[in-house]
Amino acid sequence: MTPGLISILVPCYNQGIYLKETIQSALASSYRPLEILIINDGSTDNSLQLAQELETQHPEVRVLDQANAGVTKARNAGIAATQGEYLLPLDGDDLISPDYILQGLAILATRPEVKVVYCQAEKFSNSGRKPWKLKPFSLQQLAKDNMIFVSALFRKVDAEAVGGFSEDMQLGREDWEFWIKLLKNGGEVVQLPLVGFYYRLTPTSKRKKTGGTAFKKARIAYLNAKHADFFERELNGPLRIQRTWSKPYNTLLKFFGKL
């Protein structure tokens, strides 16, 4: 591990059309030392070729090539291969601002009690951009829904301590489950006031694919099975389909002796 080094993990599956722009936004960071690890997850477009070209052009860029295994395994492969003290996942079509890492690591490097630093964000597409309105962080709010996008800053040692991203989480929102296991036993979270992350909206965005009722039910069942202790502590019982009603509903059931 190289002290002070930030490793940007860029899993990429058929995102060649956006990959160069994503890497350019990472290279434009005002923070150094920096490495960018592109994990090609079995792409069938020109992503691997583009990644290798970027690798030859920029000493900060390295490429891993693997058979298609999904984003969680791609991120974990990146974590295992990185040299950085700090990590920042960045999907192959999203962007970051030049000062995001610099401001975030100013906090992580000096405040050991802080586990995660993120920022304000915007969603964008060809038709324009708009603020991504996120609720303030608290553990109880995290139990109901995620407010930390995956492109946050954290320490490699903390990610390794919880086993990285759960590779059996194939239902979307794998970042939510990662933050739960990273933070449920302690650690502070800081949100920077700057807009530092830009989430690209595309017709194939994963959030659109995994937003249906069946996915939601399966996802909630998975989370309850894996983090029952967390939901009991924060919501007085399991997470419900109507997530914001989980705590009052559980409290009512316990009052009547039905939970």
Kindly label every feature range from the protein language model.
Residues D99-P131:
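Conserved donor NDP-sugar-binding/catalytic core segment of glycosyltransferases
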Residues Q24-P33:
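Short, acidic, metal-binding catalytic loop of nucleotide-sugar glycosyltransferases
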Residues Q66-T82:
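Glycine-rich, basic loop-to-helix element that forms the pyrophosphate-binding segment
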Residues G4-S7, E35, D175-E177:
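Cell-envelope/extracellular polymer assembly enzymes that use nucleotide-activated donors
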Residues L87:
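Short aromatic/hydrophobic "clamp" motif used to bind/position activated sugar donors
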Residues K20, D45-E53, L95, D99:
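Acidic helix N-cap motif at the loop->helix transition within catalytic regions
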Residues S138-K216:
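Conserved nucleotide-sugar donor-binding catalytic segment
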Residues N40-L50, A69, D91:
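A conserved acidic beta->alpha catalytic loop
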